[in-house]
Amino acid sequence: GAKKLLQTLRAAGLRVYILSATRHALLDPAIERLGVAPLVDGVYAEEETGSKRTEAPYAFFRDRLGVPYEKMLLVEDAPRNLAAAEALGVSGVGVYDESMKEYTEMIRAGAAVYLPDFSDLSALEELLR
């Protein structure tokens, strides 16, 4: 599922970066195991950029890549992170996660697009046009 999502983002001509709350010691092997490393331009942990609940990681990518907030896209399963991004003008794509199922409606409400799974990415493709 996630691989299809990354391929869709790439096909739209986007640079793709992974930012996770997970530390590199666990994150990097997972990315390799899933076979998605060739689909991303970089991998960062919040320990490097700051929490997604704050402006810090978005400012990090803005300053490092020269991408204004309104040109960024956050794919996220946590409503607080989507809200923080939206407050800055970053578009959010909400995704379903079993561990966050009690927050599904908040995630759906806080996202420009909501993906209950990765089987149908047409709403995302429409957003990217």
Show which residues each predicted segment covers:
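Asp-based, Mg2+/Mn2+-dependent phosphohydrolase catalytic module
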Residues: H24, D28-R129
